[in-house]
Every structure is written in structure tokens, then in C-alpha cells.
Swiss-Prot record:
This is Stromelysin-1. It comes from Mus musculus (Mouse). GO terms for molecular function: metalloendopeptidase activity; peptidase activity; zinc ion binding. Metalloproteinase with a rather broad substrate specificity that can degrade fibronectin, laminin, gelatins of type I, III, IV, and V; collagens III, IV, X, and IX, and cartilage proteoglycans. Activates different molecules including growth factors, plasminogen or other matrix metalloproteinases such as MMP9. Once released into the extracellular matrix (ECM), the inactive pro-enzyme is activated by the plasmin cascade signaling pathway. Also acts intracellularly. Pfam families: Hemopexin (PF00045), Peptidase_M10 (PF00413), PG_binding_1 (PF01471).
Length: 477
């Protein structure tokens, strides 16, 4: 009951300072909303006793002006209609000003590669729609920083993403439908970095409800260390903008300046791949990258980039750069073999596996993992298999496919064992892929099978080959 006298006195002070609404009931509701809003977002709670003791309304007027200034309203110091209207709009649950306990000292991640995990799902959207919205939201920040992100399916990630209602274990309960949509914590261990979404909202892919992508992009800005912005055009403005044209969405300059003040501009970082000195970047000793006869030994993704291996070199293709970069394999990973047979990435383990002959190696970024090489037969392949031609891992199904001559085996990444019922004929399950597979990787929802100097674009949903391309078409040749 301690809160009741405070609330009543607050009503007396504010109502005596300026007129609010005609209805006393509206006055009470407005005062209650004002108190909660200022307590939640403008640090009123620690100051309440001070202005009560002084019997002076100047502090509450000052707090209202502070709120109005931050939200871009006219600084009347009064609970006018424009202020009331904005206070009723859906918004982020993170405070706008004042000391927020999880944001001391402008924290940031002390690494460039960050993992995330979607702990549970809202029933409002298909799982793949939630996955896509979160991936797209992270991409917004990845495109303007050196940061890269990968998703894991179990264990503790840097950013744990969850949907919840009411009290959900962090002592910052959600309020039901409307108003508070989500909240997130600044970078750090434990709960820090995590993002929580109110599952009492109606989450949508468009703006007919609460758009998950827009809210996620905002909250993940907090997970990366950003505060709220006072600029209404910014993604980090605290109030949700349902009128946003999703087809024309882009970060404001204020958002870009803020995130780059923490992490810098989009350049390669040591946590992804350390670019060697120019003396190590040699001209190809094999076929030039635009040669019509060029073929690859292996192809794999690595943290959003694509690596094309050939002899003792590899081309590194990033979405941020129009042209691939060419390096010695040994300049990044001294122990890896040249003329490798296959390579694939398991994104939820942040690991790339490299195969040559009957052995395989493992790398994480520029780090070579201990305990390798291992025999390919430890994976459950029969002794008759002497080498692997190509491999790819499906991050959604958590299955890895090993291609050997005209057959393939399937490995369960969760159980860490080969699945029964294999091998199967490649041509039966991948119609149109009739020749031997040299390499394979996934991009844009398609599988790209390489055979000699050609590649087949395969639609796994339609189960058919959609295009036949040159192997080096990725190099703008």
C-alpha cells in the first residue's frame, strides 16, 4: 500500500499545476500511466521521495519535459493530448534515459563473431518465419559493422532469444497486449545480451500486427550495446512505428553512427579471418579465376562468406566485396592440406570440417582445432569408403550429407551418428544431379552442385535442377 499515497499526492501536485482532462476518472488513469511511464523509462522512482518531501511540483514538470524532449514533443511540461497519445503507443521496454543497470560503461562484445539461439517460438508465425525475421534483423547490423553472427541450436549462446508472457524470470514482467513489446540487455555474460519478446502481442511478417523483424532489429541493437535514440527516424527510437514501409527499410545515419562508434566499419576482423599481409596474397598458380576450365577441389561457407578451394590456394568471397580475394591456405591455416577433397560448415558449432583422403580436420574462424586430423571412419562411414567427394550440412535439419561417387550418406549432427538406410543413390534424391559431385554448398535457398567446370543450381523444395552455370559464376566472370 506504500504506492497509493505516492500516487494520490502525485495527482494533487500535477493537477494543481495545470488542467488535464474533464473527467476525474481520466485524470486518475492519466496520472497512473504518467507515473508508470516516468518510473519505467525516465528514472522517476529514485526521485519520488525528493519532490514529495519538498512539496514542490517542479520535479514532475521537469521529468515530463525530459520525456517530451527525448520523444520529440513540444516541451510543455504538461500532460497534454500529444504526450498522452505517444505514451499509449507500443514501445520497447528498455528505459530511454537514466541509469539502466545492464548498460554501464557503454558495453560491447569483445569479439567480432557472435552466436545466437532462438530458445522458443511464438505460435503466431511458422518457425521458419521467426528464423528468417531474426536472421534478417541481425543482417541489418552485420552489414554496417565487422560483426558476424551464427545460430546454435543448443547450449548457451551470446544472445538468447525467447518469447514469454508476464513474469518470465528477469524481474521485468511483460504487461500483456500493447505498450511494451520486448526488451533486451546489453552485451555481457549470463542474461546480458539476451532479447525477450512479449508473446501476448500478435507477431506478424507484415505490419497488420506487430512486425517481428522491426522489433527484433531494434532489440538486437540493444543486445549489441546501443541505447535508445531521440531521433524519430532511427530504428533505435523507443516507440514502435507501425507505418514503416518494410520494402524501403534502412538504418538511419544515427543508427549507423551509433553502432560503428562501438565496433567500427565493415572490415575483416581477427575473430573471423585475419587477412595476411600483401606478400602472402599471391597471384593464382592454377587456372585464372575467370578461366572457362576452372574447377574447385572443395567449397564451403564460413561465417557468411564462401571459400572456394583450389590446389594450395582459396578464393574468399564476401557479400561485402564485389571481387573475391585470393590467398594461400597455409597463410590462414598452416596445418591444413592442399588439394583437399571436401569441406562443409556446421553453423551451430561454428566449425568448418576439411577432408582429404581418409582424414578430416576442423577449423573455427582462423583457429585450427586440437584433436585433428581424425579418420573419416570415426563418422560411421564403412571401410570401403577411402575418400569423400563433397559434403554439406543442413542447419535446419541438422543433417550432414556425404557424397561419394554416385551415392551419399547422411549424418545426424545431433546424435553424432550415421543414419540407417544409407547410402542412397544421388540421382534418386537429387534428380538431375547425375555426374560425380566435386563440391556443394547452399545459398539463397538453393544447393549448388559443382562438377568439373560446371555447377547445377538445385531447388530442394521442387527437387529439380533450375540452372546450369559455370563454376566461377560467383566471381562476376
Amino acid at each position: 500500500m506504500k504506492g497509493l499515497p505516492v500516487l494520490l499526492w502525485l495527482c494533487v501536485v500535477v493537477c494543481s499545476s495545470y488542467p488535464l482532462h474533464d473527467s476525474a476518472r481520466d485524470d486518475d488513469a492519466g496520472m497512473e500511466l504518467l507515473q508508470k511511464y516516468l518510473e519505467n523509462y525516465y528514472g522517476l522512482a529514485k526521485d519520488v521521495k525528493q519532490f514529495i518531501k519538498k512539496k514542490d511540483s517542479s520535479l514532475i514538470v521537469k521529468k515530463i519535459q525530459e520525456m517530451q524532449k527525448f520523444l520529440g514533443l513540444e516541451m510543455t511540461g504538461k500532460l497534454d493530448s500529444n504526450t498522452m497519445e505517444l505514451m499509449h503507443k507500443p514501445r520497447c521496454g528498455v528505459p530511454d534515459v537514466g541509469g539502466f543497470s545492464t548498460f554501464p560503461g557503454s558495453p560491447k562484445w569483445r569479439k567480432s563473431h557472435i552466436t545466437y539461439r532462438i530458445v522458443n517460438y511464438t505460435p503466431d508465425l511458422p518457425r521458419q518465419s521467426v528464423d528468417s525475421a531474426i536472421e534478417k534483423a541481425l543482417k541489418v547490423w552485420e552489414e554496417v559493422t565487422p560483426l558476424t553472427f551464427s545460430r546454435i541450436s543448443e547450449g548457451e549462446a551470446d544472445i538468447m532469444i525467447s518469447f514469454a508472457v508476464g513474469e518470465h524470470g528477469d524481474f521485468v514482467p511483460f504487461d500483456g497486449p500493447g505498450t511494451v513489446l520486448a526488451h533486451a540487455y546489453a552485451p555481457g555474460p549470463g542474461i546480458n545480451g539476451d532479447a525477450h519478446f512479449d508473446d501476448d502481442e500478435r507477431w506478424t511478417e507484415d505490419v497488420t500486427g506487430t512486425n517481428l523483424f522491426l522489433v527484433a532489429a531494434h532489440e538486437l541493437g540493444h543486445s549489441l550495446g546501443l541505447y535508445h535514440s531521440a531521433k524519430a527516424e532511427a530504428l533505435m527510437y523507443p516507440v514502435y512505428k507501425s507505418s514503416t514501409d518494410l520494402s524501403r527499410f534502412h538504418l538511419s545515419q544515427d543508427d549507423v553512427d551509433g553502432i560503428q562508434s562501438l565496433y567500427g566499419t565493415p572490415t575483416a576482423s581477427p575473430d573471423v579471418l585475419v587477412v595476411p599481409t600483401k606478400s602472402n596474397s599471391l597471384e593464382p598458380e592454377t587456372s585464372p579465376m575467370c578461366s572457362s576450365t576452372l574447377f574447385f577441389d572443395a567449397v564451403s561457407t564460413l561465417r557468411g562468406e564462401v571459400l572456394f578451394f583450389k590446389d594450395r590456394h582459396f578464393w574468399r568471397k564476401s557479400l561485402r566485396t564485389p571481387e573475391p580475394e585470393f590467398y594461400l591456405i597455409s597463410s590462414f591455416w598452416p596445418s591444413l592440406p592442399s588439394n583437399m577433397d571436401a569441406a562443409y560448415e556446421v553453423t551451430n558449432r561454428d566449425t568448418v570440417f576439411i577432408f582429404k583422403g581418409n582424414q578430416f580436420w576442423a577449423i573455427r574462424g582462423h583457429e585450427e582445432l586440437a584433436g585433428y586430423p581424425k579418420s573419416i571412419h570415426t563418422l560411421g562411414l564403412p571401410a570401403t569408403v577411402k575418400k569423400i567427394d563433397a559434403a554439406i550440412s543442413n542447419k535446419e535439419k541438422r543433417k550432414t550429407y556425404f557424397f561419394v561417387e554416385d551415392k551419399y550418406w547422411r549424418f545426424d549432427e545431433k546424435k553424432q551418428s550415421m543414419e540407417p538406410g544409407f547410402p542412397r543413390k544421388i540421382a534418386e534424391d537429387f534428380p538431375g544431379v547425375d555426374s560425380r559431385v566435386d563440391a556443394v554448398f547452399e545459398a539463397f535457398g538453393f544447393l549448388y552442385f559443382f562438377s568439373g567446370s560446371s555447377q547445377l543450381e538445385f531447388d530442394p523444395n521442387a527437387k529439380k535442377v533450375t540452372h546450369i552455370l559455370k563454376s566461377n559464376s560467383w566471381f562476376n566472370c
